[in-house]
Amino acid sequence: MATAEELQKTWELTVQVDQRAGDESMKFKLRVKGNLHIGGLMLKLVEKIIAPQDWSDHALWWEQRNCWLLKTHWTLDKYGVQSDADLRYTPQHKPLCIQLPNMKYIKLTVSYSTVVFRAVAEICRTLNIRRSEELSLLKPTDENSKKKKKKDKNPVLEDIIDMDVVSGGSGGSASPLYSKTMIPTYDPENGMPVSATSMWFGDNPLTSSQPNLPPAELAKMYQPMSMVDKAVINAGWLDSSRSLMEQGIQEEDRLLLRFKYHCFFDLNPKYDAVRITQLYEQARWTILLEEIECTDEEMLMFASLQYHICKLTMSTEPLDFSNEPEIDEVEAALSNLEVTLEGGHADRILEDITDIPQLADSLRLFRPKRLTLRAYKDYWFVFKDTTISYYKNKEVSSGEPIEQFHLRGCEVVPDVNVTDRKFGIKLLLPVADGMNEVYIRCDNENQYAKWKAACILASKGKTMAYSSYRAEVKNIQSFLKMKSMAPPPGQAAPELETMEMNAECFVSPRYSKKHKTKQLTCRILEALHNIARLSLMDAKMRFIQAWQSLPEFGIKYYIVRFRGSKKDELLGISYNRLIRIDISTGSPVTTWRFANMKQWNVNWEIQQVTIDFDQGVSIAFSCASCDCKVVHEYIGGYIFLSTRSKDQNETLDEELFLKLTGGQE
């Protein structure tokens, strides 16, 4: 019997116990002391529960404080738990409904107690997606679709893939989606499976592309119409340094798994079947729902690639890699992708070049001014280092130029229509009070490819002496070839009857309204001539590569208020730069590159982000469309991704990621 003095030191604590499989929860009252550690409390609780079961996955959740009590050696006093605390003894792993980039839903048991960064890594391991640091979880914009009762007659719910059933596992540690008897062995040098995907990857529904929706269904889906709408969507990214439960996510809630950071490292068709397919699907939906802007010509190119991929998907065995290109061709494609993305490989200066190459051509120039028609004038242009100079003609090019453009930190925007033989480059040059526009017009594809590639490198502070220049030129030439509507010489005109699907399925609803079905079919089949020989995986890679070439690729928008300003503006965050954008016109005002960033800080009390760049440039802003933690994490995440290299294995440096992206804690 406890003495009266001992009873005065103890107090009553109520704990609700959640059980699995839909069993009703139980409530228990325990007499405890403040010096009782969490592990001892759980032991007391389990001893009092009559129903025998495995409680190893259970942990204590504190409702009022919205936190897990995971440090079992901490006492109740240290956590601040008192008699009025509302504690739940609940499973740490719970089912979650996840919409994949291909818009399909899966149900998967994930950890609700670990930080989201680690939970996403668990999800990607189960789905066999490498480089989980590139993905994250996003709250759907329609909160009504977040929580659905099981009795709801929702056609989407009936199509959910239960991954615990598919992978033959359940509970805390879901099994990866491959045969347990054929688990791949990973090379410690590069983190790659020793055997090819086709050898160990099972019959995986996630490697096949989804059929395109009928036009009527596509039209019903939500389409962001402005940058402000996109800013609302981007506010929904979960905090990677907090758990699902801490962010209000409950059992069987719905979240979207998406590629958050558009810096795709080491894409390999031999081992990344799921990753490439899901990346293609995310790219495809951004085109169809007009979440990213593209020209009519580009829309047709994407439509022809989708049609080609659909045909190959229906006619090819899911794991037939016999038609895939040999490794040298794959490496070439990957090289192009890495050039576009700065995906972590080291760009080096070519050893055999003693003098930095330069370009010299007769081009046309236009400087937009108010109330003037667009009139291009011929000049002699010289591109040297990271600077463009132009002269009245070639004969006077040894003297002083009319003007020079310094391209470091500029924006390079294509102004191209291959069908109309228009090959233009728009340069947005940073100046003290914003950006100056300059238009340069080239004569042909090859000239355009060389000059645009040089401009892209110069904007990053690199010259044509870097190894990536030649690959960038080839990448641009390949992109132009895909956009060309002209069939190869001697090729007969397409027969409209040969198209087995509705052409309107492959373009955005807005674009389909501009053209009759017959006209659209004809144009897609014409564009198909340039890609008809691509294999399934190569076609997906080309689609991704073309998506990366769009001016708006990878830019996430947020509504912010800059220090000293009295109006809201847009901040665009890309994989290599920050862009200040006029919210009324959508035009870039200033660009700051991550390469020039010295440091950034967050004042959590006033929710303000401050960033210091080279040459004494400093900016500060508060966020209007989201918590500043979302923007802080985006910046830190891209800095983290820039530290990756092929020499490292696939072990994630979680500590470094959380250090760069974490909050006040």
PLM feature spans:
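Intrinsically disordered, Pro/Ser/Thr-rich cytosolic linker and juxtamembrane tail regions that serve as
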Residues: 1-665
